[in-house]
A protein has these predicted regions:
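Nucleotide-sugar donor-binding/catalytic module of glycosyltransferases
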Residues: 1-227, 231, 329
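C-terminal subregions of glycosyltransferases and related glycan-biosynthesis enzymes
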Residues: 169, 174-179, 183-184, 201, ...
Length: 338
């Protein structure tokens, strides 16, 4: 057993598989660091999840349920959990409902917060129910600009300092398909004391049919034709139409718009001394296509993004130009002022 300062584990739950949920909560209770509270933010009716938690944890008082029955989606459900973090917390960990942590996960990551604002690690990729290990993550921290361009930080692998919450909350408002909590938190952390990804394996990253995203390192495959179908489906769901203008808006928000939203929101919330002019030239309201293209070329050369990503990013820029993208982001930034 290890002694450590008090912290909070934020777990986002939605209709969890009872067996996977049982294993995950058991792995939390087995942590060598024991002084923590687990805030379980329930998307939807909290009663069934509360009953399951009571049964699994045998009344362990470290688990607390939050939720009012409303459906927020994955992104804003994590925001609700973070809003419930105790002011006593000296560290925060994000948790999915269906993974399984190694017993020393928190203990191994916690010392890094003396030097950086957010630390992430690696995971074994395990298929369920076969329990077969199909691979391991190979996340790398390429620095703040490349983190904005292509997120390598997976929320369930992260531990961060509560100093980030004053800047990160409320989350920027965008489509739940576009916006991701871990990308936003990594961007915020980079503007504070920095980020770090270590090589330690700290958990099983469980893959099954009900995953919201699956292993992020395996996303983005498929043909251009499949990408077009996906963006049409997303436009219909989030923009209410498959019209050319709706598809243009969705394409813009998927790449350029989401990154502009993060940067412009960040710049409103941090001291002027921490505003990065390079970041703004590539991603912010004053972004320049030449600066973005230069960064994409470097990212391609270093293998940070594939050629298809660079192509789709440039297409997203064009879609923003024809759909009033900059103005739409300005409105979204204003809507999410703390």
């Amino acid at each position: 057993m290890s002694t450590s300062p008090f912290g909070t584990i934020v777990l986002a739950a939605y209709s969890p598989d009872p067996e996977l949920f049982r294993r995950q909560l058991a792995s939390l209770r087995a942590q060598s660091v024991e002084d923590w509270e687990c805030v379980i933010s329930v998307d939807g009716d909290p009663a069934p999840v509360a009953a399951l938690v009571e049964e699994i944890t045998e009344g362990d008082g470290r688990f607390r349920i939050v939720g009012d029955g409303s459906r927020l989606g994955f992104y804003l459900n994590f925001e609700r959990g973070l809003l419930a973090v105790s002011e006593r917390s000296t560290w925060i960990a994000l948790c999915d409902q269906d993974d399984r942590w190694d017993a020393d996960k928190i203990e191994r990551l916690l010392p890094h917060l003396d030097e950086v604002s957010l630390v992430s690690a690696q995971a074994r990729i395990v298929s369920y129910p076969s329990e077969k290990e199909t691979g391991r993550t190979a996340r790398q921290d390429h620095g703040p600009l490349f983190t904005l361009l292509s997120n390598e930080f997976t929320g369930s692998l992260c531990l961060f300092a509560p100093e980030l919450l004053a800047t990160a909350l409320p989350f920027p408002r965008a489509s739940t398909r576009v916006a991701t909590h871990d990308h936003w938190l990594a961007v915020v952390a980079a503007a504070h004391r920095g980020t770090r990804i270590v090589d330690d394996l700290v958990q099983d990253y469980v893959q099954h049919d009900a995953n919201v995203f699956g292993d992020p390192s395996r996303l983005g495959g498929g043909s251009i034709r499949q990408s077009v179908r996906n963006i049409r489906d997303q436009a219909e769901r989030y923009e209410g139409s498959r019209s050319p203008r709706a598809i243009a808006r969705m394409t813009f928000w998927t790449y350029v718009g989401w990154r502009q939203l993060m940067v412009d929101t960040l710049d409103r919330r941090i001291p002027e001394s921490r505003i990065d002019a390079r970041r703004d030239r590539v991603f912010g309201d004053g972004r320049r296509f030449r600066a973005a293209s230069a960064l994409l070329r470097v990212a391609r050369r270093r293998g940070i993004v594939p050629a298809r990503f660079a192509l789709e990013y440039r297409a997203s820029w064009l879609c923003g130009a024809i759909s009033g993208g900059r103005r739409a982001v300005r409105r979204a930034v204003a809507a999410a002022r703390p």
